[in-house]
A protein has these predicted regions:
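Transmembrane alpha-helices
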Residues: 77-93, 128, 182-214
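Generic hydrophobic transmembrane alpha-helix motif, especially the helices
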Residues: 58, 62, 68, 93-94, ...
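Short helix-to-coil transition segments within interhelical loops
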Residues: 61-66, 103-104, 173-183, 187-192, ...
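Glycine-rich helix-loop "coupling/hinge" segments at transmembrane-helix boundaries
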Residues: 132-134, 161-162, 203, 211-253
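C-terminal transmembrane helix and the adjacent membrane-cytosol boundary/short C-terminal tail
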Residues: 195, 202-203, 244-300
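Hydrophobic alpha-helical transmembrane segments of membrane transport/permease proteins
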Residues: 12, 28-63, 220-226
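Transmembrane alpha-helix signature in integral membrane proteins
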Residues: 68-103, 257
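N-terminal signal-anchor/first transmembrane alpha helix
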Residues: 1-38, 115, 193, 298
Length: 300
């Protein structure tokens, strides 16, 4: 039996399934304005609380007669875009700070890391609440507050990676050749450690979706009539007894997408670092042993 290629080992069933879920969410976000069957903010008093599978409304309508499917698709645009913006913000700010602090070390590194330790001791959502209380509620403030809350962990991760990598022989060689420190950090060290960071950044997308949905659920994120999955969840909670799908649909979507993102990030981590792969169970060992014995008998 031929061994699978390195790329083939990555495309396991769980990788493919989780990847499909993520691609569907991204496709819905990108094409939201085109594929929505109705205007998500169009009010129709004659169609309030229509149940699922009603004529023209697959998932029914809310208390204002707005099509739930259209609002979920448009909510995907807001939720996915916000999640990617949050991760982009933490990467652009956190990674350079962590790399520079780890490369140079010294008192500045010690002071900045102690500040990050204090910030990390505050739960991300609590820190977001504090920032929103200072700067006001809204989608932009929500994205920035969560992004700021995520920066310390990203910076600490980048710092820990470069502390190990800067001792490599190639770094010493570049130093002896007179290369600028910034060029060594961002053009030579960063490409060698970025693969380790990718799995964490992928997982942060799922965390960002949940965090932003939480803020919107509490009325601190995106404001009506615009919708994301958090506002739809809050609206469904208020009107659960009139149409349970209003609550179930956004809850299931948030769960599916975040679980898919986490599984996909685990797959990336296992692919990058084979030592992270789970050990086979006893039954799997037994099946392999039986397979080997059968091949040996066939060969005889």
């Amino acid at each position: 039996m031929a061994k699978r290629s390195k790329v083939g080992k990555f495309f396991t069933p769980k990788t493919v399934i989780s990847g499909i879920v993520i691609l569907i969410a991204i496709a819905a976000a990108i094409g939201a304005n085109v594929i929505v069957p109705y205007d998500p903010n169009e009010v129709d008093p004659r169609s309030c609380f229509l149940p699922a599978f009603s004529k023209g409304h697959i998932l029914g309508t809310d208390k204002l007669g707005r099509d739930l499917l259209s609002r979920l698709i448009m909510g995907a645009k807001s939720s996915m875009l916000n999640a990617f913006l949050i991760v982009a913000f933490e990467v652009v700010i956190g990674v350079p700070i962590g790399l520079i602090c780890g490369y140079y070390g010294g008192k500045i590194d010690a002071v900045i890391m102690r500040i990050w330790d204090v910030v990390c001791s505050i739960p991300s959502l609590l820190l977001s609440f504090i920032l929103i209380a200072i700067f006001g509620r809204g989608n932009f403030t929500g994205v920035m507050s969560i992004g700021i809350a995520f920066i310390p962990l990203t910076a600490k991760m980048a710092r820990s990676l470069i502390i190990t990598e800067k001792k490599a022989v190639y770094v010493e060689a570049f130093k002896s050749m007179g290369y600028l420190d910034m060029k060594i950090i961002f053009f030579h060290i960063l490409p060698n450690v970025i693969t380790t960071m990718i799995a964490q950044f992928t997982m942060d997308i799922g965390a960002a979706i949940v965090a932003m949905a939480t803020l919107s659920y509490l009325g601190l994120g995106i404001q009506p009539p615009d919708a994301d999955w958090g506002t739809l969840l809050e609206n469904g909670m208020q009107n659960f007894y009139n149409n349970y799908v209003l609550l179930a649909a956004p809850a299931i979507i948030i769960m599916l997408v975040t679980v898919a993102v986490n599984i996909f990030s685990d797959c990336i981590q296992e692919y990058i670092d084979p030592s992270q792969r789970k050990l086979p169970t006893f039954k799997q060992y037994e099946k392999r042993l039986i397979h080997i014995r059968r091949r040996q008998k066939a060969a005889i």
